[in-house]
UniProtKB/Swiss-Prot annotation:
Keyword hit for Mitochondrion: yes
Catalytic activity from the UniProt record: NAD(+) + ATP = ADP + NADP(+) + H(+)
EC number(s) per entry: 2.7.1.23
Region (Calmodulin-binding): 167-196
Entry GO MF terms: ATP binding; calmodulin binding; NAD+ kinase activity
Cellular component terms per the entry's GO annotation: mitochondrial outer membrane
Protein name (record): Calmodulin calcium-dependent NAD kinase
Gene: NADKC
Species annotation: Arabidopsis thaliana (Mouse-ear cress)
Record carries keyword GTP-binding: no
Cofactor: Ca(2+)
GO BP term, example: NADP biosynthetic process
Signal peptide: none
UniProt binding sites for ATP: G238, G239, M240, G241, A242, G243, K244, S245
Gene3D superfamilies in UniProt: P-loop containing nucleotide triphosphate hydrolases (3.40.50.300)
Length: 534
């Protein structure tokens, strides 16, 4: 059917008007998008300029480059190997493939990485010194590379663990995995719920020693031995990545713990994460982008398992080493109170952290058992616990770098903000904890490649004695900004990073570095030039 001329003409006119409107709207939207992008870029540049001004323009180039992507696509960070090449003065990292391979191998500590570096330099006259300088430069680059872009730590980890070709074009698989993460996690959690309960119980029995076919009580920790001495609760505290494991190794060499260690109960929430059946099931699938979420999924269950093991060990009068951040004051205070009274009254798990419908918060992590103390003769034979505290602090940017590198190697990661919060909270709480314990020590692990330094100590009722210079580390950490995106935003006064004694100043900004970099770059050019081309 043919439409009347007037109606058809009117329709064409309306379509034309609509087309013009759509065109104008599109142009307006495009202009707005361009303006927003430009404003965002200006803000980014201004932020970088402000950071550069606070630190000095000489080290602005230290920050990794970021390749901006279209809206909805994550940005690509400069790859670590390319970053190393740029720090050594090479404009095109693709011209130095062997160097890039060595840098990645060192970052991930792949098998034989040190032998590969030695082989790479074998024809150089100054082979030994170049070997040392190259590894030192790798270490500097690891520290500086991980001192920026903290909100993109998940992207950074995934990129480091993926092939370079995988980063050029985002795969459909990546989008699908991200979109289905919640459903996948829920399915695995549901399927393994019962198995997890049994597995966690078995793990607790293994750690406590009850599952052994031989009696687990020895002269060191049995109630008979406690007639001669009190059992010991050692609290190892410090932010994530502070270096607690390093300090604990030294403590195990001390006369008391060298004998008591074998029968002591060592409690660490992270250890329960690694044995959690749900965590292992998800981690075994090798999805790098799931790493942070997987650790977060089992965080509460691993914390509960550690708390359950703690109360069991204290009820038995065992020597206990509690290894954790100790960053949540109510939890630590209740733990110490329980340890003070457990020789008189047994305890059990409490309800934990609860928020009522009205918004009221209650925290009850442990509670006394209902039965009378007199009914338990064994409990009356125990001596009061001696409670010792060993704290570990370091500049938080060092801990972030350690944490991300550890994530690359053990495939277990944490977000940077909670990590920074754990450092700040522990630093603020440490003086309060010292008043609640019988003995306290504080170590600083800022020395790169060096041993931990004892910077504060307290024994008995004495006041906390401190090293007046080194205690500044605790003060800095107590005032850090947990929302920092980079090292430049970490402390209220960024200029302290460039002062003598600062790791950043003494390791990264060391005056001899440009000369060493020149020697390395000259040698690398010779070596790469002599390499056969593919």
């Amino acid at each position: 059917m043919v439409k009347p001329l007037g109606e058809g003409t009117r329709d064409v006119s309306n379509v034309g008007c609509k087309s013009v409107d759509l065109l104008l709207a599109s142009l307006g939207g495009l202009a707005a998008a361009v303006a927003a992008a430009y404003a965002g870029e200006l803000l980014l540049r201004r932020r970088k300029l402000d950071q550069g001004a606070s630190m000095g323009y000489k080290d602005v180039k230290i920050a990794p480059l970021i390749e901006r992507k279209d809206s909805g696509r994550r940005s690509n960070l400069e790859r670590f190997s390319h970053y190393v090449a740029r720090q050594l003065g090479f404009e095109d990292p693709n011209e130095y493939p062997q160097l890039c391979k060595l840098a990645n191998g060192y970052l991930l500590k792949t098998k034989g990485y040190d032998e590969n570096v030695d082989e790479y330099l074998e024809n150089e006259a100054e082979r030994d010194s170049l070997y040392v300088h190259l590894l030192e430069e790798f270490d500097r680059c690891i520290l500086t590379y991980f001192s920026f872009n903290w909100t993109q730590s998940s992207n950074l980890i995934s990129q480091a663990l993926s092939d370079e070709s995988d980063q050029k074009v985002p795969k459909l698989k990546d989008f699908v995995m991200a979109a289905t993460r919640k459903q996948r996690f829920e399915r695995v959690t549901k399927d393994l719920k019962v198995k997890r309960v049994i597995s966690t119980l078995v793990e607790e029995m293994r750690v406590i020693g009850s599952g052994s076919s031989e009696p687990h009580c020895t002269e060191v920790m049995s109630p008979v031995a406690h007639n001669k001495r009190s059992p010991v609760l050692l609290l190892m505290g410090g932010g994530m990545g502070a270096g607690k494991s390093t300090v604990l190794k030294d403590i195990f060499l001390e006369s008391f713990w060298s004998e008591a260690q074998a029968d002591a109960v060592v409690i660490e929430a992270d250890a329960f994460k690694e044995t959690d059946v749900i965590y292992r099931a998800l981690s075994s699938r090798g999805h790098h982008d799931d790493m942070l979420q997987t650790a977060e999924l089992v965080h509460q269950s691993s914390t509960d398992a550690a708390s359950s093991l703690l109360v069991t060990a204290l009820n038995d009068g065992r020597d206990v080493i509690m290894d954790g951040t100790l960053s949540w004051e109510p939890f630590v205070e209740q733990m110490i109170e329980m340890a003070r009274n457990v020789h008189k009254q047994k305890y059990r798990m409490g309800e934990g952290y609860k928020v009522s419908e009205e918004g009221t918060i209650t925290e009850k992590y442990w509670e006394e058992e209902e039965e009378e103390t007199k009914e338990n003769g064994k409990q009356q034979n125990l001596k009061p616990y001696r409670i010792e505290l060993v704290g570990v602090v370091c500049d938080a940017y060092l801990a972030v770098a350690r944490g991300i590198r550890r994530a690359l190697m053990v495939k277990r990661a944490v977000r940077v903000k909670p990590q920074l919060n754990s450092h700040k909270r522990f630093a603020n709480a440490f003086p309060k904890y010292c008043e609640l314990v019988d003995n306290a020590r504080l170590y600083c692990t800022n020395a790169v490649g060096g041993p931990p330094r004892l910077i504060a100590w307290k024994d008995g009722n004495s006041k906390l004695l401190v090293d007046p210079e080194d205690i500044d580390c605790l003060k800095r950490v107590s005032s850090l900004n947990p929302d920092a995106e980079s090292i430049y935003e970490l402390y209220p006064d960024p200029s302290q990073l460039s002062k003598p004694g600062s790791v950043w100043n003494d390791v990264v900004l060391v005056p001899s570095r440009p000369k060493v970099q020149k020697e390395l770059s000259d040698a690398i050019r010779r070596i790469e030039k002599a390499q056969p081309k593919n």
